[in-house]
Every structure is written in structure tokens, then in C-alpha cells.
């Protein structure tokens, strides 16, 4: 049996290989027992539950690799719900701040939980949220540690994890051919990951990654891999809540000036907005774009009053203008050809700033500010209309104030920001729990066309926090214990022309999601979305049915997409277009996911047939994978996608 277990860890049927070797020096009360782990493992992966609480098409705008890395790591090292702090719970994007308050109140009133099934006694926690929490939490009678552990215990009881990954394609790509424009490296993608951790107190590790086509151990990569990430994080060290060195990510306020962490789409707004917690996370993924490099720390000055400081210096990829300035900052992280390598680490960026926030009896207020500079000036091509207000120069600053209030029924949050641009951006959200079965959410945002922040990432219909004025209204209703209806409507207006438009545009976006639970094992769902943006109309329809037992899970889904393109008169398309008729296309996907769990063995399989007329009618689907390797892909044309995965 140990030999079979090792081989299954090493082999992925299809196109990849991966090894994952956890090593535990010893065990103490901070380690979760195998019995507890086995009790709460579900035969259906958490990714599929999360998919139903999110919008598939919004994953294109999400740093999904960073997001999946963090949640997968938490799934591998779940938290004891009885001892988890409010900040730790708020790291999960599917829990609202008011739901976290309800959980904390329940734990305080009843002195903890005996089983995870008690979550059903909290009316504000939905069925899907309970299933997700089973993947990231467990219940045990553990006493929270009162002081930071000794170095001796950290070294003795800490856990070492080593993981390697190799992807072998069974096809030839255009760039694999020899020639001046071909890739300089081989077609295999591989990487290595090491991490040492002791509970929630110490985390240290590194990541080495190589994309297919990149040279390994030669040229600029004389140290082997093209990308490395090193990090060290210490938490709960007296008044020091967090000390992080190396590569890290930050989320301050609601992201109007600083957020290089992930953010979600509109459907998840119903659960994610209202949080303004300052968060420092290690950068342990393969992504070479959204990270800072240096040091960041949070210190508690007084009860409820925290101060965060951060400093970063890193190299960046860029294309240069004829004058020698930065025309475009590149974030692909690909260095396969001579042209891509010539743009590697061509400039540098320095960032220094801080955040201070205060919390008391549900109220919170904070302020964030930073100064950033580049070794070469930013010189965008402002002759293009949509780049007219792009940042220009070599030094920039931004400041913001965030605020809010959280209670059982109300969740209010907002942030207002400005900077050297002299313009203003503001985002404000409010959610009211009318009853245990009905809640309303409203979001207002105004982002001036002249406003910019180089590190912003927040709620928006467009691709950036700039030139947008909109209102969002959403609701969640549970008319009975078996039914849940979620809906939203969002309107946005863009005063300045966007890419491929010639005038002001607007968008309407509507969604309705219906969930029905005929029994504890069966789930039926439907989702319809209608979106009109700059004259282009996209409609999406989805039906699915899933069954989950102790060892088996199965999910069948049907997706249909209809797209209609607006004409040039509506302000869309290329300016040179002479088409007088609107183009339209459609597509569909039939997909099946099956999972099996038995003791240490987990098997997953997916099979899908898709048929779309073009890229505009593309379909999105979840595809299982090994640790930190699964994906949500978009497919167009006609074809079959399948995957078989074995894990232990």
C-alpha cells in the first residue's frame, strides 16, 4: 500500500507529473489529527462549491493562480473553528463580515462548537458556505496558545513540505520549432516548491518555476529557474501581528489605491464587500506579476489600533519607447524568445508606504498612503484616446481613507482616494439583513477618468479603477430551507472612450441564480445572465445537477452562450469597420465531473464537449488538477476536454 500511495502521488494520467512529500518532525497540540482530517473530507472538491458562488467569466480578471494557491494551502492546513480569529475568517472570500460576526457570537455564547454540523444553526450561513467551510475548518477542543512558541518547539514540531511539478505536452507548438523566432528553451514546464511552517506562527519557503519554452540554467537563468520567490512570515509575536520578509502581497482598504492580491466578480460582491482589513500575505505562487519585494509588518499600538508599514524594491519587465521611457509594463512573466528576454528586468520600481486603522464596537476607520517611483519614466502612447489619462512620469503618490460599520444586520464599508493626479475615486457599499432569509446589497462607485493608481484593484466593470460611474444592487433570498435565489443588476457609465470605442459608453449587467436542494445529497441549480456593454450583448444560461455521497460525487452541467455584436454606430468595434450588420454567434458545453474518495485515495475525472462559433461565444469550465494546478478555462471552437486525476 505505501508503494501504491507513492506512485499515485507521482503520476497524473494525461500530461503532468507531480510529487508532494510532507515531512513532520513531530506532533504537538497545534497539529491536526488524521482522524479529524478524515472526518471532514468531502468527496466533492471545494473548487466546485466555490464555482457556484462566483461568476466563471470573471475569472479572466482574477489572479486565479494566486487565489487558488492560497485556498489550496488553507485546505491542506485547515483552521480550528473554535480558535480561529476574526481576521483569519475574513480571509475567506465567501464569508461576509456580518456572517463572521454571527459565527464569533455563536462561539462565544455556546463556548465553541462540538461538530461542524452546528453551522446549520446559524441562519445566515448558506448550504454552499457550510460545504466550503468543511474544507477549510475543523472543530476540536484545543486551547488557543497564549504566547509565541519557543524556537526549540518551532524547529521540533514544524512541518516541511516539498513539491515538484513537471508538465509534458503531447503536442508540438509553433514556437517549439527551431529558428530566430522560436523558443530558446524546451517545451516542458516544471517547478519546485518548499515550505516550512509551524501552525499559524511561522511560514518560510521558496518557489522555483519554469514556463515552457524558457531556457533553464543558461543565459540570464544561470541559477536554474527563470522565476524564484523567497519569503518568511512570522505572526502573533506579541504586539507584532505580522512580520513578512521577501516577496509578499498587500490588500489595503477596498483596493482603490493598493491591492495586488486577488479580487472577485460581481456575484461574490454579495459576500466579499465591506471588508477593509489590512492584509499581508506571502507570495508563494508562480505568478511573476502581482507581488512586492522587501518587507512589511503590522504592529498593534493599542487595542483596536494597528499600524502597517511596507517597503518594496523589484525589477519589472517593460517595453520601451523611442525616447527611452517605459511604454508598457509587462506582467506575463514569459521569457521564451530573444525579444521577450530583451524586455526582462529592464526597469525597477520602488514603493514605500503605510496604513493605520482603528476598530471599536463594529466601527472601523483607516488611512493608507504610499509613494512610488520608477528607474525610467512612464511614457504611454497618449495619442490613443483610451490612454489619454494614463499615468506619466517617474514618481507618483496616492492616499485614501476607508471606513465602515459591521453589526448583525448592517454591513457598511467604503473608501475614498486621491493622488498626484488631482482626481478622486470613491467606492461605497451597504448590506442589510432584512431577515434571516433575505438580504439586500447596494454598491456605488465613482472613478474619475483622470484618477489612477498603479497598484489599484477593486470592484469595477472595466479593467481598471478609472473612468467609471456605476450602481450595483443585489439580493439573496431563501424562501424555504431548500431554496436559495441570488440576483443582481449593475449599471455602469464610462465617460471617456475605451479600447475599440469612439465615444462614451455604458453597460447593463443582470444575473439570476437559483439553487434547489431536494435532499441532502442532491443539488439542482440554474443561472441566467444578460449583459449589454457598448452595444454588444452577451447572454449565458447554465443548468446543473449534482449528487454527493460519503465517497462519491457527480456533477452534470449544460452551458449555453449567445453573443451579438453592436455596429460601429454604437461606438464599438474598430474605427475602420465598414460592417453594417450586427454579427452574432452562439455555443454550448456539455460537461460531467465525477469524484471518488476512499481513505487516502482521491480520484477525479471530467469530460466535456464544447461547440462554439467563435471566441466571443466562448464557454467557461472547471477542470480538476493536482495541488496548485487546477484551472478554470475558456474554450471555443469544437472539441473535447477531459482530465483524470489521482491524489492522496
What are these regions, as identified by a protein language model?
Residues 222-317, 438-453, 602-615:
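Outer membrane beta-barrel
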Residues 152-159, 201, 234-243, 252, ...:
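Short loop/turn motifs that connect adjacent beta-strands in outer-membrane beta-barrel proteins
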Residues 26-216, 220-233, 238, 247-251:
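Compositionally biased linear targeting/interaction segments
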Residues 183-187, 345-380, 388-648:
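Exposed, low-structure sequence patches enriched in small/polar residues
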Residues 209-227, 281-288, 342-345, 417-419, ...:
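Outer-membrane beta-barrel proteins
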Amino acid at each position: 500500500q505505501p508503494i501504491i500511495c507513492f506512485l499515485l502521488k507521482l503520476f497524473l494520467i494525461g500530461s503532468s507529473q507531480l510529487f508532494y512529500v510532507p515531512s513532520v518532525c513531530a506532533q504537538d497540540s497545534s497539529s491536526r489529527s488524521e482522524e479529524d482530517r478524515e472526518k471532514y473530507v468531502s468527496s466533492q472538491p471545494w473548487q466546485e462549491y466555490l464555482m457556484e458562488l462566483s461568476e466563471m467569466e470573471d475569472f479572466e480578471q482574477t489572479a486565479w493562480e494566486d487565489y487558488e494557491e492560497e485556498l489550496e494551502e488553507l485546505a491542506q492546513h485547515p483552521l480550528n473553528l473554535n480558535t480561529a480569529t476574526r481576521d483569519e475568517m475574513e480571509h475567506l472570500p465567501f464569508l461576509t463580515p456580518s456572517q463572521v460576526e454571527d459565527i464569533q457570537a455563536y462561539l462565544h455564547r455556546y463556548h465553541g462548537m462540538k461538530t461542524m454540523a452546528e453551522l446549520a444553526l446559524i441562519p445566515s450561513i448558506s448550504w454552499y458556505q457550510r460545504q466550503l467551510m468543511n474544507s477549510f475548518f475543523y472543530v476540536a477542543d484545543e486551547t488557543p496558545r497564549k504566547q509565541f512558541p519557543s524556537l526549540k518547539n518551532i524547529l521540533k514540531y514544524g512541518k516541511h513540505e516539498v513539491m515538484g511539478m513537471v508538465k509534458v505536452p503531447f503536442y508540438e507548438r509553433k514556437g517549439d520549432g527551431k529558428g530566430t523566432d522560436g523558443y530558446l528553451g524546451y517545451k516542458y514546464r516544471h517547478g519546485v516548491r518548499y515550505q516550512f511552517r509551524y501552525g499559524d506562527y511561522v511560514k518560510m519557503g521558496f518557489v522555483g518555476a519554469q514556463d515552457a519554452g524558457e531556457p533553464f540554467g543558461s543565459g540570464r537563468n544561470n541559477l536554474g529557474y527563470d522565476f524564484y520567490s523567497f519569503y518568511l512570515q512570522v505572526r502573533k509575536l506579541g504586539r507584532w501581528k505580522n512580520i513578512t520578509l521577501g516577496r509578499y502581497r498587500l490588500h489595503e482598504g477596498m483596493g482603490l489605491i493598493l491591492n495586488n492580491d486577488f479580487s472577485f466578480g460581481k456575484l461574490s460582491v454579495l459576500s466579499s464587500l465591506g471588508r477593509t482589513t489590512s492584509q499581508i500575505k506571502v507570495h508563494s505562487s508562480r505568478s511573476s506579476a502581482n507581488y512586492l519585494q522587501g518587507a512589511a509588518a503590522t504592529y498593534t499600538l493599542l487595542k483596536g489600533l494597528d499600524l502597517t508599514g511596507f517597503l518594496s524594491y523589484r525589477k519589472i519587465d517593460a517595453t520601451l519607447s523611442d525616447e527611452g521611457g517605459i511604454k508598457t509594463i509587462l506582467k506575463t512573466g514569459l521569457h521564451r524568445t530573444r525579444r521577450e528576454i530583451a524586455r526582462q528586468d529592464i526597469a525597477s520600481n520602488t514603493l514605500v508606504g503605510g496604513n493605520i486603522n482603528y476598530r471599536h464596537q463594529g466601527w472601523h476607520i483607516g488611512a493608507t498612503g504610499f509613494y512610488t517611483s520608477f528607474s525610467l519614466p512612464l511614457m504611454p502612447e497618449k495619442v490613443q484616446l483610451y490612454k489619454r489619462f494614463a499615468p506619466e512620469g517617474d514618481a507618483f503618490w496616492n492616499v485614501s481613507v476607508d471606513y465602515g460599520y459591521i453589526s448583525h444586520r448592517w454591513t457598511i464599508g467604503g473608501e475614498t482616494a486621491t493622488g498626484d493626479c488631482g482626481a478622486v475615486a470613491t467606492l461605497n457599499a451597504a448590506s442589510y439583513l432584512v431577515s434571516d432569509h433575505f438580504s439586500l446589497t447596494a454598491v456605488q462607485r465613482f472613478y474619475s477618468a483622470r484618477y489612477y493608481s498603479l497598484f489599484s484593484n477593486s470592484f469595477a466593470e472595466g479593467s481598471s479603477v478609472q473612468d467609471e460611474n456605476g450602481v450595483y444592487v443585489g439580493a439573496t433570498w431563501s424562501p424555504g430551507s431548500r431554496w436559495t435565489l441570488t440576483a443582481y443588476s449593475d449599471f455602469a457609465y464610462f465617460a471617456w472612450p475605451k479600447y475599440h470605442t469612439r465615444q462614451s459608453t455604458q453597460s447593463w449587467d443582470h444575473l439570476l441564480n437559483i439553487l434547489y436542494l431536494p435532499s441532502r445529497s442532491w443539488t439542482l441549480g440554474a443561472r441566467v445572465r444578460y449583459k449589454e456593454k457598448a452595444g454588444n450583448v452577451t447572454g449565458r444560461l447554465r443548468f446543473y445537477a449534482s449528487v454527493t455521497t460519503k465517497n462519491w460525487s457527480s456533477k452534470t452541467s449544460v452551458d449555453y452562450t449567445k453573443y451579438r455584436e453592436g455596429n460601429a454606430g454604437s461606438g464599438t468595434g474598430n474605427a475602420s469597420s465598414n460592417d453594417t450588420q450586427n454579427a452574432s454567434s452562439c455555443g454550448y458545453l456539455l460537461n460531467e465531473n465525477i469524484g471518488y474518495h476512499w481513505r487516502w485515495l482521491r480520484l477525479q475525472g471530467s469530460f466535456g464537449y464544447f461547440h462554439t462559433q467563435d471566441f466571443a461565444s466562448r464557454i467557461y469550465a472547471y477542470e480538476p488538477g493536482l495541488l496548485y494546478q487546477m484551472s478554470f478555462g475558456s474554450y471555443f471552437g469544437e472539441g473535447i476536454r477531459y482530465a483524470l486525476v489521482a491524489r492522496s
